[in-house]
Amino acid sequence: MDLILWRHADAHPGEADLERALTGKGRRQAASMAFWLEKHLPDSTKILASPAVRSVETASALGRKFKIIPELAPGAQVASILAAASWPDSRQPVVIIGHQPALGRLASLLLFGVEQDLSIRKGAAWWLTNRSREDNHITTLRAAICPDYL
């Protein structure tokens, strides 16, 4: 299974948390990352977004249908994100558009076996792949890309 963790792009501060919209920089970050993702994601990819405006705007940059999942809102628990993604059993790739620190903690758990803080920059995407071999789940990092480098 492929799981792509895409942190929402840069958003305006100081507003009600769920209502914070992307800044001009954030819109550019989202567009850059969406362009890269569009070249690499299969058509069958399932896209799930937090209900926060900044996540919805980030997801919208991809130009594909996506589903808003309340369990991905700021403050999400790692177990809730895994359940929403059907990890590790989904037969199709899944993109999660969400928030720190949950995305970083999820990446840490899948890559290192321990849930701890790991920084994912605004607008960045981490592409994780899980393969099962003889009842072992092996997770590898295929890509970690910041929009600044695109």
Features from the language model and the residues they span:
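Extended, charge-rich low-complexity interaction segments
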Residues: 102-107, 150
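Internal catalytic or translocation cores that form aromatic/hydrophobic pockets or channels
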Residues: 77-94, 102
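Active-site-proximal alpha-helix that buttresses catalytic centers in soluble enzyme cores
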Residues: 2-79, 115-123
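Domain-level recognition of soluble alpha/beta enzyme cores
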Residues: 114-140, 147-149
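Generic beta-sheet signal
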Residues: 3, 45, 90-98
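Histidine-centered catalytic micro-motifs
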Residues: 5-11, 96-103
